[in-house]
Design a protein with these regions (language model features):
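Short, small/polar residue-rich loop motifs at catalytic or cofactor-binding pockets
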Residues: 258-261
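N-terminal [4Fe-4S]-dependent radical SAM core
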Residues: 1-10, 239-252, 337, 341-344, ...
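Short catalytic/ligand-binding loop motif for oxyanion handling, primarily in non-cytosolic enzymes
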Residues: 20, 31-33, 66-68, 95-96, ...
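Structural recognition of alpha->loop->beta junctions
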Residues: 99-118, 180-215
Length: 361
């Protein structure tokens, strides 16, 4: 049994995706594409449940979970074990396979995050969607799923609709330079338009004044959640660097803190365990579930223990982590290193005490 409990485990049921988003490293991922076999998934879920290893299990890392051939069986398996399951989807199958809408509602999954990201036809171009899926079809499928879930009195699924915020931020090194939604005015305009669209006919819709006040609190360039109803929230997230993988010059971090292996871990579809959701290519393999238990990998074996011990001493020793936590200038690298300590050691604990559930994916 692990001597500590993770906040979340990212469980990648597949790394196959039907989108090729410009802001995602899918195009440069070198791993073989594939799906997790059911016996391996069952082993992972059994151990997580038996030892209460994580507060949240998320079908999330790379790939699109809703094109996993066994996705609804996988959801049922997780929920049958009493796991707090979250799922992140691009939402494309809500139009391509409309039966997915009601099937997902019927599962009773606690939370679904829809990576809308690009909220209009112009920005949808950067998603690399299948050619037969037009922007309005994509938006309509998502809209119908959200409305159906809101209208279903038997569903307690909470949906987060995620928007990509490309407002420049001093702590971030973008994966690529792009413009989707930038600044307070543009983001508030998009949030308002989508709130009106999703809540049309909803009995729990806030008053217009209340809705505008909630959206007016949005601050650009940071992660934020705006609750619309108990079952629906809008979420904004800044453009990320994916570990500075494509930056030509990076000043590596030498100190700082990351919650990889202490608060989170990932399980890739082939059973490889990685320290965090950003290790999309399995560059820091901690072990494999086919050979060892998750408890052994996280709490006994040297790779995870060494990484965690280093971060606990505010040391960044792994070269992949050094690059991820570094930046393209000395000043920004220093800001990011100091900021990582301030965020994880001060800001994050305070926010979790003030707002239970804060920081959940």
């Amino acid at each position: 049994m692990v001597s500590y409990r993770l906040e979340r485990i990212h469980l990648e049921v597949t790394n196959v995706c039907n989108f090729k988003c410009d802001f995602c490293p899918d195009a440069i991922m070198e791993r073989k594409r594939g799906h997790m076999d059911l016996p391996l998934l069952e082993k992972a879920l059994d151990e997580i449940a038996e030892h209460n290893l994580a507060k949240i299990v998320a079908f999330h890392l790379m790939g699109e979970p809703l094109i996993y051939p066994h996705i609804f069986k996988a959801i049922d398996m997780a929920l049958a074990r009493g796991l707090n399951l979250h799922l992140t989807t691009n939402g494309s199958t809500f139009h391509i396979r409309p039966e997915h809408r009601q099937k997902l509602i019927n599962t009773g999954i606690p939370k679904v995050t829809i990576s809308l990201q690009t909220p209009d036809p112009l920005t949808f171009i950067i998603r690399g969607a299948p050619p037969q899926l037009k922007p309005e079809q994509y938006f309509d499928g998502i809209t119908q799923y959200v409305r159906d879930n809101l209208a279903d009195p038997n569903s307690n699924t909470r949906i987060h609709l995620k928007f990509l915020d490309t407002t420049p931020h001093p702590f971030l090194v973008p994966h690529k330079q792009m413009h989707v939604v930038e600044g307070k005015a543009q983001m508030q305009q998009e949030l308002t338009a989508w709130a009106d669209r999703l809540l049309d006919g909803c009995s729990q819709r806030p008053s217009d004044d209340d809705l505008r006040q909630r959206i007016a609190r949005h601050k650009p360039g940071r992660w934020q959640v705006i609750e619309l109803t108990p079952k629906l929230a809008l979420e904004t997230f800044p453009l990320d660097s994916w570990g500075n993988v494509e930056s030509t010059e990076v000043i590596p971090a030498t100190f700082g803190y990351c919650n990889g292996t202490s608060d989170q871990a990932g399980i890739l579809y082939d059973g490889t365990v990685v320290p965090c959701c950003k290790d999309y290519d399995g560059q820091i393999p901690l072990g494999n579930l086919r050979d060892h238990t998750l408890c052994e990998i996280l709490d006994v074996q040297k790779p995870a223990c060494g990484l965690r011990q280093g971060f606990n001493q505010l040391k960044v020793t792994n070269p992949i982590c050094q690059r991820c936590m570094g930046a393209d200038t000395q000043q920004k690298a220093l800001l990011r290193q100091v900021g990582s300590v301030a965020y994880f050691k001060v800001y994050n604990p305070i926010m979790k005490r003030l707002q239970p559930g804060w920081g959940e994916i």
